[in-house]
């Protein structure tokens, strides 16, 4: 994948930052940085990949090929998910913190799936990288801003309905039925929407 050097660079930068952080900051920052990794990979890089494929007429070829929309989208979700998982686990391993790696892995895969689907959906409606950036910035703000409020102590149960908060809780090892249901519903909804977006 053409973006692998950039993904590797992000991972290396994250690991370096975590290694030099004082211990009181490390626990919170580790989970936040691991969360941001699938967000950036899934949303930003997937958007760029889809735009490149559109410029190469891949979408038109897909329309007349035996490959289904579901197979196309799932291949993106799985490939980006595995890259995000590898990157996230490496960050966790080198952070010097203890983690529940099962919870972490599930959170990374679900987060990667969600934001990959968001990236596919957004890029289906635009044709240039500039337009994608205009849409991506407010999307990132909506996705990430509630985390700062949550980590500062405002931990209302209603906030668990926000996908990013649910993912942060899951990656931290704090499993709840509400957070699992919330992120599952968000992923299913975005999968349906991305299928409809690619078909249009």
State each model region's role.
Residues 1-2, 109-145:
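A structural motif at transmembrane helix-loop-helix junctions in multipass membrane proteins
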Residues 1-45, 134-147, 182-191:
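Hydrophobic alpha-helical transmembrane segments of multi-pass membrane transport/permease proteins
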Residues 31, 39-44, 74-75, 99-106, ...:
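Short alpha-helical transmembrane interface motifs in multi-pass membrane proteins
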Residues 145-197:
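Terminal transmembrane helical anchor/hairpin motif
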Residues 69, 77-127:
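Alpha-helical transmembrane segments and their short interhelical loops
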Residues 42-46, 90, 117-122, 163, ...:
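Hydrophobic/aromatic residues in alpha-helical transmembrane segments
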Residues 26-64, 69-91, 135-138:
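Hydrophobic alpha-helical transmembrane segments of multi-pass membrane transport proteins
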């Amino acid at each position: 994948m053409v973006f692998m050097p950039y993904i590797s660079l992000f991972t290396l930068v994250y690991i370096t930052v975590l290694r030099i952080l004082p211990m009181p900051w490390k626990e919170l920052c580790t989970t936040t940085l691991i969360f941001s990794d699938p967000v950036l990979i899934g949303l930003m890089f997937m958007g760029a990949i889809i735009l490149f494929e559109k410029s190469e007429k891949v979408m038109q070829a897909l329309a007349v090929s035996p490959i289904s929309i579901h197979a196309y989208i799932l291949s993106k979700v799985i490939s980006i998910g595995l890259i995000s998982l590898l990157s996230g686990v490496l960050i966790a391993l080198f952070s010097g913190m203890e983690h529940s790696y099962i919870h972490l892995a599930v959170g990374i895969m679900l987060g990667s799936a969600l934001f990959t689907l968001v990236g596919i959906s957004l890029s289906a409606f635009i044709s240039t990288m500039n337009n994608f950036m205009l849409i991506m910035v407010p999307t990132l703000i909506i996705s990430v801003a509630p985390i700062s409020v949550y980590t500062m102590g405002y931990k209302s149960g209603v906030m668990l309905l926000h996908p990013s908060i649910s993912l942060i809780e899951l990656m931290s090892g704090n499993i709840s039925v509400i957070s699992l249901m919330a992120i599952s519903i968000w992923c299913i909804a975005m999968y349906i929407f991305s299928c409809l977006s690619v078909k249009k």
